[in-house]
Each structure stands twice: as structure tokens, then as C-alpha cells.
Amino acid sequence: MSANTSEQALASLIKWLRNRHAEVMAAEAQALARLDAGDTPGHNEHMRLKAELLAAMAEDAKPQLEPLPGETRFNYALALEGFSASARMSLRLNSIFYMSALLYPDDHKPGQPDNLTLCIDRMEKMGLDFRTE
């Protein structure tokens, strides 16, 4: 695979990840709006959707990862699996609190980027040299 083809595949993956992130954030925003309106079942439903989107992310990204070279594909898949595994655990535990905390470190402050945003930014910056931390 040529470097140009790999870079195109990587650009496609980054775009796909940013779109998935936007879906996750939209579900979270809906959940918070429902909570503000006193609609706890609606809040829980949208937090569950957030977790489901993240849980499926690693699997859903496979077609985007396929064109990447082996080691690069592995490193990207490993990073995405970390997010998906946490989300699957929150669903298995049926923990709305855990679902709400997905993507955020313990010391997260409003206005700071979430962990998925930081990861996508690192992927974009490092390109084919991306490694998990």
C-alpha cells in the first residue's frame, strides 16, 4: 500500500471517528437535557445510547481500519477497543453513573476536551506512527 493510500485511509478513519464522537456527544447532550427537564427515564435512555455507540465503535470502525498497514491498524484498533471495552462494561453493569462518566477522567473540568477527542487529535497528529499511551 502506498503512503498516499494509507494517508487517505487514515483521513477517512479520522473523519469517521469525529462523526461517531459527534453522535456520542449528541446522545449525552440529549441525556443531560432530559435530566434538566426532570425526565429520568429519558436521561437513562440517552446515556444508554451513548454507551451503545461507544461499545460498538471498535467493531464498527473495522472497515475504516482495514486499508491501514498491519502495525498501524493494530495500534488504532487497540486504542478504540479501550473505549469500547469500558462502554461494554458500563452496559453489563447497567450503571448509568458509569455510562455518564465514559470518556472523562476523574479530574475532568467543564470545557476541557474528553478522552476520545484527545485520542482522535493524537491519531490525527501522529498519523501512521500512532501508538497507544
Where are the language model's segments positioned?
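Short terminal alpha-helical segments
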Residues: 2-48
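A structural signal for well-ordered alpha-helices, especially hydrophobic packing surfaces
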Residues: 21-28, 54-65, 87-94, 124-127
